[in-house]
Amino acid sequence: STVFYHSESGILNCGPLADEGEEDIDLINAGGQFLQAVPGMSFFSSVEGFAMIRGGHVDVTVLGAHQVSSKGDLANWMLPERGVGNIGGAMDLAAGAKRVIVAMEHTDRYDNVKIVEECDYPITGKACVSLIVTDLAVMQPTVDGLILLEIAPGWSVEEVQSVTGAQFIIPPDLKEYEL
């Protein structure tokens, strides 16, 4: 099937990132990166972009996170120790996309756990995350808890568990990452 990348700034069928020296100030994604124009690329207002998201027309979104709970709660808009945050479009994506995948490092830069039993950071979306992909593991949050699906080469279940703030359910068909 065909994948069309959507930018909440008002682009559908986003092209690849522009090469240095080829930047066009009119082709910028929601992250502020310059894009290359591609055939079929379309432009619209951010209002229409958010209508697509809120209307359930986005199949999959990939978001970063500060914390994810074992039940799939997402916290990605504010770090309480900073006292400020900006929720941006993540709340709309968490609520409007059919599937939410979180891609993040397994721990923060201070080695604090980011996958927790219950989020203690402000919640962006409740029970919205369907898959967590980190540098150490792939996990699936469920109402019964966190299922460990894949583990990074060279890491044991015990080692990954020691840097995770929620207990795993370990299925009999646990796989190693294929890099």
Residue ranges and their predicted role:
Residues 1-16:
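N-terminal low-complexity or amphipathic/hydrophobic leaders
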